[in-house]
Structures are given as C-alpha cells and as structure tokens.
C-alpha cells in the first residue's frame, strides 16, 4: 500500500522541476514532459521510489539505527527541525560543519562542551565566575547550540541520512559517501542521481513539497521506532544488560535452586502415585462393601415374606 497518493503529490507541487536551462541530463529518465519551459517530473516513478525509501528508513530505525535529517536552505529549515524532533532523530538545519561525519571524534568533544555549558547558571555570579566570563560562556553556548543543537544526542555516526537539495548539501553527501552512509534525498531536475542511494524525484524548492516528503520520512522513522519497542515483547526477551558481580551471584543461586526444585516435586509425585495405585489394587482385591446383585436381593425379600406368613398371630 502506497504511503502517499499522487493527488497529494500534485497538491504540494512535487512534480514541478527546474527550467530547461537548468537541468542534469542524468535526470532525463525521471522527467515526464516539459510545459512552458519547465520540466515536469514523473510522479509514478516518484511514488514507487517513495515506498522504497520508506521501507528502508523503517527497517533501519527498527534495527536500532538513526537517521540524520539535513536541510539548510530556508525552505527546509523549519520542517527538518520539526519532523526530526517529532521522532527523536538528529538534524542539521543550519550551516553544515565540515568534518561533522568524517571527524566525528572532534565534533563529539564539542557536543560534550555544549552539555557542560547547559548546566551553567549564567545569572549566578557566586560560582567563582565574573560577569564577563559568564557572558563569554553564554555566547559560546549560543554558538554551539545554533550549529550543533540538533545533534546534541548523537553518540556515533548516523546509519543513514535524509537530505533536502542534494546539490546544495554536497559537502554532507561527500562525507556520507566516504563513510559508506546511505543517503535518501529529494532529486530535482538539476541534481545528480548517482550521488544518492535512495532517490526521490521531486521539487526541492517548494515549502509544501519539502514538508510533505520530510514528513513521510519521519513517519517511516516513527513506524520503525514502534517496531523496535515491540520486538522484545514479541520475542519474550529484552536486550541483555551488564550485571554487577553480586547480581550475577544471586542470579546463579536462583537458577541452581530452580534446577533442584523440579526433581523433588517429581519424587513426591511418584511416591503419591505409587500409594494411590497400591490402595486401588487392595480395594479391587477385597472390597469392604461390595454391592449385592439383583438376584440375591430378590431372594432375601422372598425369605422375609415367607417367615412373616409362618409367624403365629397373637390374640
């Protein structure tokens, strides 16, 4: 079942490409026709590729992966931040920092610095800092928040990357290709489809088009998160966590006690069943109150009647 309809794509203007003077010949296979000097994108192909990208994102997140949302152009900044925050995924909607992926160790140090500054009370001058020092720290925090705030919870390189306007975000795509990170992206008629593993032909300039496609990717991530949390319940086992030594000893003692318990119960059950069998055999061999047959009962009744007739009647 398609996650979006062609009518929705048409209403959001996903089918509008760039003018004929600004196009990449490699995108020719995704172009349906040309109207008034503007290329029209084939939405049938877009629909199929959206479903493919949706399934990939869902499976990636379901298996514990993360999707980095990237879109620094004005048309994409708001929807990138909104949808990424909705599903708890990292995002970059300001300037892309060179080396964010290829030099992630250094970036991670700056993220730790940002978390340290978040704990500072800039209005409290009794902690040993002067007002000037607090002002400098506040400016540093604001600068880090603007550039790294969207990836503050990113502990390792992402599993995949969603990109709006692959031509503008060429630095991010180059770093992802060096690290072998799959890229899902909107391909307008001026983009290179060879740079993206999961292309979605569409309009990357219209706000409604960008918002719709970004929401679809976020919905796929949300569905993957639901599957991830349902897996331990379905399989009946939660992911193992490291135990302390004393916890491990208690667990081993409990396992040993459980291993001995069924043996004792089996012995008791065997003894009880043996007694019941012996008792039933004795009752069958020598019944205490065996029921009388119908013939014996009739003979007894006739004898009592005869005796009563022979007995003398008292005057």
Swiss-Prot record:
Which GO MF terms does the UniProt record name?
Answer: structural constituent of ribosome
Per the record, where are the segments of Basic and acidic residues compositional bias? 272-282, 297-315
CDD domains registered for this protein in UniProt: RPS2
| Annotated transmembrane regions | none
Q: Does the keyword Ribonucleoprotein apply?
A: yes
Q: Does the keyword Ribosomal protein apply?
A: yes
| Gene3D superfamilies linked to this entry | Glucose-6-phosphate isomerase like protein, domain 1 (3.40.50.10490), Helix hairpin bin (1.10.287.610)
**Domain of life of the native organism:** Bacteria
The molecule here is called Small ribosomal subunit protein uS2
> What is the name of the gene encoding this protein?
rpsB
Ranges for the region named Disordered are 250-315
Matching SUPFAM superfamilies? Ribosomal protein S2 (SSF52313)
Task: Kindly list the GO CC terms recorded for this protein.
Answer: cytosolic small ribosomal subunit
Which residue pairs form cystines in this protein?
none
Q: Which GO terms describe its biological process?
A: translation
Q: Which family does it belong to?
A: Belongs to the universal ribosomal protein uS2 family.
Keywords, sorted A to Z: Ribonucleoprotein, Ribosomal protein
């Amino acid at each position: 079942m398609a996650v979006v309809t062609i009518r929705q794509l048409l209403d959001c203007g996903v089918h509008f490409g760039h003018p004929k003077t600004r196009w990449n010949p490699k995108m020719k296979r995704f172009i349906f026709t040309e109207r008034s000097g503007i290329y029209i994108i084939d939405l049938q192909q877009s629909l199929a590729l959206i479903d493919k990208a949706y399934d990939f994102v869902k499976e990636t997140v379901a298996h514990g992966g993360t999707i980095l949302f990237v879109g620094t152009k004005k048309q994409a900044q708001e929807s990138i931040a909104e949808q990424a925050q909705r599903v708890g995924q990292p995002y970059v909607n300001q300037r892309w920092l060179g080396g964010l992926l290829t030099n992630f160790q250094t970036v991670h140090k700056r993220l730790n610095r940002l978390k340290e500054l978040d704990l500072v009370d800039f209005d409290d001058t009794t902690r040993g800092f002067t007002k000037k020092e607090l002002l400098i720290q506040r400016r540093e925090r604001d600068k880090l928040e603007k550039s790294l705030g969207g990836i503050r919870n990113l502990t390792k390189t992402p599993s995949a990357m969603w990109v709006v306007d692959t031509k503008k975000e060429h630095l991010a795509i180059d770093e992802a290709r060096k690290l072998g990170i799959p890229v899902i992206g909107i391909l307008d008629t001026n983009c290179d489809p060879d740079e993206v593993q999961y292309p979605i032909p569409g309009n990357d300039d219209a706000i409604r088009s960008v918002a719709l496609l970004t929401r679809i990717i976020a919905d796929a991530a949300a569905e993957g998160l639901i599957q991830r949390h349902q897996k331990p319940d379905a399989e009946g086992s939660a992911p193992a966590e490291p135990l302390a030594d004393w916890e491990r000893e208690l667990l081993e003692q409990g396992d040993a006690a459980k291993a001995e318990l069924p043996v004792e119960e089996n012995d008791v059950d065997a003894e009880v069943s043996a007694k019941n069998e012996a008792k039933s055999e004795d009752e069958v061999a020598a019944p205490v109150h065996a029921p009388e047959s119908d013939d014996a009962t009739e003979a007894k009744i006739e004898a009592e009647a005869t005796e009563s007739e022979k007995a003398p009647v008292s005057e």
